[in-house]
Structures are given as structure tokens and as C-alpha cells.
């Protein structure tokens, strides 16, 4: 297959492009100057020339703080860009896989784990933009597969990347002077990016719809870390671990996802604790 991967310089996109190419696919990773997803003329010209069989749309402004401060600019990238790609996919017959986010569940009045059919009213700009993009892409191109991704980590950091949960935890584990404090009012899944990437080929075959696409978790972040340290018998860090009672205390965050729909389609992920235990255990 000829695949377009947008956001190929980002955390997910660069790994997705490399993995899909290793499977023998022709993977196209145009630069912004070659394909500006926010300009309809650029999208039309590029698709007319290259005609990919499928699009894996990873590009986004994913920093929730930037989205809050600059909602107009982030709307152009996070909503208008996917819409233009959906139009192009409809016109050329390409399959669209849209990378959405568990942030669509932020502010939900329902406790997690959340299922895809829940009525949603995201409590932050980024979540609202992702949900709107899901809806508009589905309306334009009903075969669109929207993947609601969780917080991702890797066992290595590539040049130019910011830190993630695992790098932050590793830094604290290696420095006894660093505090180890994690929130008790924050519930979310964490997924190894390698699992996401390895499941993308199967996602290309999913029928159009929305899918929770990541690791399940039945603990808050503090108790996830505590269980992880206990499983790995890391007694010294355990003695430093304290619960953060202030973060999210006024507005607890529960964006955990129920992956039953995905499991029924034959796609599975390790649980958050399983993935972190295996990954961190291999790094220590």
C-alpha cells in the first residue's frame, strides 16, 4: 500500500512511518512545504499527484496549554486540517485513519472507563477540537477510523523530543534527591507507543467508526506508580513516593478508556501496569 503519514516528525508519526515502511509499504512523509494540510489547494494538488491508498493522520497541535491559549490557531490545525484530508480521501477513495485523543473524555460527568458511545462535552479546547474533527471527518467520509489515543511513552527518546511519563519517572528513580509525587485525582491509561504503531495495520482494516485505542487502567496515577514500584521491588523509590492530593482536586480527571469495542475487533493492548512493568523492568 501507499500510505501518507502526516506529522512524521512527531512522537507517534515518526515511529509509525518507520514501522510501516519496515513492513514493505510505500510510506510518504511530505514536509509542510510539500503538503500544507490547512490549505485546500495544497491538499488537492498533493493528493492528485500521489493518490495514497490510506492516510494516517498524526499531525496536530497536541499541547493542551497551547490549545487553551491559542484556540483559533489550533482549530485550524486540529479541525480544519483533518476536514480537508477527509474531503481528499472521499474524492480519491483513500482510507482515513484519524488520530484522536482520550482528552475528549475530560470533564465527562460519567466515571471511567469510558466507552465510545458516551455523550461527550469535553472540558478543554483540545478535547473539543478532537471531538469536532472526529464528527466532521465521519460526516464527510463515513469510512473514517478515529482512534482515541491515550498518553503514550517509549523506552527511548529520539532527538528533539520532549519528555514523557516514563522519562520523568526514570529521572526521579535515578536521583534519590528528587521527590516522587503523583496525583490521586488523575485517572488515565498509558500506552507504549510501540504497541500503538504495531496495531496500526490492523486499524486500517477496521470499519469506519470511533475506537478507544490504547491501554486500559483501573488505578489513579499515584496508585499506578506505587503498583509499578512494588512489582519491580524498588524499595528505595517506594519510600519516597507520596500522593499529590492537590492536583485535580477541584476537578478530578478520569479519562480512562474501555477498550471492549477494540477487543471485539481482535486488537489488544497490554494494560497500563503490564506495559509499564515490562518496559521499565527492561530499562533498569
Which residues does each predicted region cover?
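Glycine-rich Rossmann NAD(P)(H)-binding loop
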Residues: 154, 181-187, 211-219, 264
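Conserved Rossmann-fold NAD(P)-dependent oxidoreductase catalytic core, especially the SDR/UDP-sugar
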Residues: 83-121
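Alpha-helical substrate-binding/gating segment
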Residues: 167-179, 187-212
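Mid/C-terminal beta-alpha module of Rossmann-like enzyme folds, strongest
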Residues: 197-199, 203-246, 280, 284
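NAD(P)H-binding glycine-rich loop region in Rossmannoid oxidoreductase-like domains
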Residues: 40-77, 88
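NAD(P)-dependent short-chain dehydrogenase/reductase
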Residues: 135-188
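C-terminal amphipathic/interface module of NAD(P)-dependent oxidoreductases
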Residues: 235, 250-284
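N-terminal Rossmann NAD(P)H-binding glycine-rich loop of SDR-like oxidoreductase domains
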Residues: 1-21
Amino acid at each position: 500500500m501507499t500510505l501518507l503519514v502526516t506529522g512524521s516528525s512527531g512522537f507517534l508519526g515518526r515511529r509509525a512511518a518507520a514501522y510501516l515502511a519496515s513492513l514493505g509499504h510505500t510510506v510518504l512523509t511530505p514536509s509542510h512545504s510539500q503538503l500544507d494540510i490547512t490549505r485546500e489547494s495544497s491538499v488537492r494538488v498533493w493528493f492528485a499527484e500521489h493518490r495514497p491508498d490510506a492516510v494516517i493522520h498524526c499531525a496536530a497541535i497536541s499541547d493542551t496549554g497551547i490549545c487553551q491559549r491559542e484556540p483559533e490557531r489550533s482549530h485550524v490545525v486540529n479541525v480544519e486540517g483533518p476536514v480537508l484530508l477527509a474531503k481528499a480521501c472521499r474524492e480519491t477513495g483513500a482510507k482515513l485513519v484519524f488520530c484522536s485523543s482520550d482528552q475528549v473524555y475530560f470533564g465527562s460527568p460519567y466515571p471511567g472507563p469510558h466507552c465510545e458511545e458516551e455523550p461527550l462535552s469535553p472540558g478543554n479546547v483540545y478535547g473539543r477540537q478532537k471531538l469536532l474533527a472526529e464528527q466532521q471527518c465521519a460526516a464527510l467520509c463515513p469510512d473514517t477510523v478515529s482512534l482515541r489515543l491515550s498518553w503514550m511513552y517509549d523506552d527511548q527518546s529520539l532527538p528533539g523530543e520532549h519528555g514523557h511519563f516514563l522519562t520523568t519517572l526514570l529521572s526521579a528513580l535515578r536521583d534519590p534527591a528528587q521527590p516522587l509525587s503523583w496525583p490521586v485525582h488523575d485517572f488515565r491509561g498509558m500506552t507504549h507507543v510501540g504497541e500503538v504503531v504495531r496495531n496500526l495495520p490492523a486499524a486500517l482494516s477496521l470499519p469506519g467508526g470511533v475506537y478507544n485505542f490504547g491501554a486500559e487502567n483501573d488505578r489513579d496515577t499515584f496508585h499506578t506508580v506505587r503498583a509499578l514500584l512494588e512489582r519491580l521491588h524498588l524499595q528505595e523509590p517506594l519510600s519516597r513516593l507520596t500522593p499529590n492530593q492537590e492536583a485535580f482536586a477541584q476537578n478530578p480527571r478520569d479519562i480512562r478508556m474501555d477498550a471492549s469495542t477494540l477487543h471485539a475487533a481482535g486488537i489488544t493492548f497490554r494494560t497500563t501496569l503490564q506495559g509499564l512493568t515490562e518496559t521499565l523492568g527492561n530499562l533498569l
